[in-house]
Amino acid sequence: MMFTPLIVLTLLVLATAEHQCGPNEQWSDCPKCELQCGESDKPCATICGEPKCYCSPDKYRRIPDGRCIRKIQCPQH
């Protein structure tokens, strides 16, 4: 029975680790829209996407490095 606490601890660590987001990102269980540099006119989905970290509402995803940045930092702004 000594393995039970170890298993619980491992599951807890794994569950919290997947919610670690990068700078200017936040976790959502139901992301619907994420702005991307160069695609500000792209319509947003009305259904939930896959749970993930996505850019904060006032930030844009820069391609190809995937960082979340201010709109003015987007290439060719």
UniProtKB/Swiss-Prot annotation:
Residues 1-17 form the signal peptide. Disulfide bonds join C21-C53, C30-C48, C33-C44, C37-C74, C55-C68. GO terms for molecular function: serine-type endopeptidase inhibitor activity. Keywords: Disulfide bond, Protease inhibitor, Secreted, Serine protease inhibitor, Signal. Residues 21-74 form the TIL domain. The record marks T46, I47 as: Reactive bond. SUPFAM superfamilies: Serine protease inhibitors. It is found in: Secreted. Its main location: secreted. GO terms for cellular component: extracellular region. Coiled coil: none annotated. Defends the organism against the host's proteinases. This is Serine protease inhibitor 2.
